[in-house]
Amino acid sequence: GRNCDILLNGKDITWQVRRPEVDANVSQVSAYAGVRQAMTVQQRRIGARGRVVMVGRDIGTVVMPDAGLKIYLDASPEERARRRYQELLARGEAADYEEILAGVRRRDQIDSTRDLAPLRPASDAHRINSDGMDAEQVFSVVMNLATQDDPPAS
C-alpha cells in the first residue's frame, strides 16, 4: 500500500515512481556517476536540515555515513516480490509474481556488484530482516531503535 507521499514540484507522483518500469531501470540510471553525485548532493542537503528518514541502497554507506542511526532493512527476494505483487494487485494493476521476483533478483545483482556505491550494509547499521513481518511490526522495531539511540532532551 501507500506508506508516504512523494511530491515533485508540488505534484503527487507517489504511484508513478512505484511503477514496475521505474523499478526495472533505477539501477541502470543510478550507475551513472554524474546522476549518483547529483543525487548525493541533494540528499546531503536534505539531511543537513536536521532529523530525517532516508531510504536508499547507499544512504548509510555513501550519502550519510555519519548518521546517528542507520538501519539496514532487508527481506528475501521472495518476500520483497510478494509485497510488490500484493501492492500492484491492490491498486488494480496486472502483476506476475515470477516476473517481479526476477526483477528483484536482477536489481540486487546489479546493485551489489556495481563499482560505484555497491549495495551493502554500513558496518555500524542495525540490520533488520523483515521476512514475515508486517509494516506495523517493522515500524515497532525501528521505533524501538530510534528511541534507544535518541539522546535525552536537555
Feature-to-residue mapping (PLM):
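Generic structural signal for secondary-structure transition and capping sites
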Residues: 34, 44, 51-52, 109-116, ...
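Glycine/charge-rich, flexible interdomain linkers and switch-proximal surface loops
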Residues: 56-58, 62, 101, 117-125
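Residue-level signature of catalytic and energy-coupling elements of molecular machines
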Residues: 10, 39, 53, 104, ...
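Long, charge-dense, solvent-exposed interaction surfaces that engage phosphate-rich ligands
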Residues: 1-9, 19
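An amphipathic alpha-helix signature
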Residues: 77-85, 97, 101, 105, ...
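ATP-dependent NMP and nucleoside kinases share a basic, alpha-helical "lid"
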Residues: 14-93
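NTP-dependent small-molecule kinase module
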Residues: 7-14, 23, 85-91, 110, ...
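Canonical AAA+ ATPase core
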Residues: 60, 81, 90, 100-102, ...
